[in-house]
Amino acid sequence: MNLFDILGPVMVGPSSSHTAGAVRIGYISGKLLQDHVVKAEILLHGSFATTGIGHGTDKALIAGLLGMRPDDIRIPDSFFLAKRDGMEFSFSTITLKDAHPNTAVLRLTGEHGRKIEVQAASIGGGRILIAKLDGIEVNFSAEKPTLIVHNVCLLYTSPSPRDS
């Protein structure tokens, strides 16, 4: 741990967990989608659900999806910017079993039809933990390069001998 971990990240406030961490969750989720986000269904759990709106968690998540970082002064305007860019988004609450109190589930759709579901938690000091990708348990912070292999099953049928 270094001095900057103790002091917390440079950020637009008010909270390193509810704002800076939420921006990072949105940012990493958008990167995992590998497409321009056009639709986001965001489910908030625990303290994200109960106090997140007052702490700007909602705006921070959208800001991250727009590619902003925690110190971006445009975070408070993220709803306006997202709507201007054509992004549809909605928020609701969810109760998750055995999840960190600052957890969000992001169901994202990209402009080319790509979809992803990310479950992530803000664990303090602006740090995050990605807990699930498309329902599969994972465990990474995105603080260091991470290789993610997405196994896609392709069905290929060859013509039967009678068809030739």
Residues covered by each model-derived region:
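Conserved phosphate/anionic-ligand binding catalytic regions in large, soluble enzymes, centered on
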Residues: 10-25
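Short glycine-/aliphatic-rich beta-strand segments at the starts of folded cytosolic domains
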Residues: 139-151
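Non-transmembrane, aqueous-exposed alpha-helical and coiled segments at domain scale
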Residues: 32-41, 69, 101
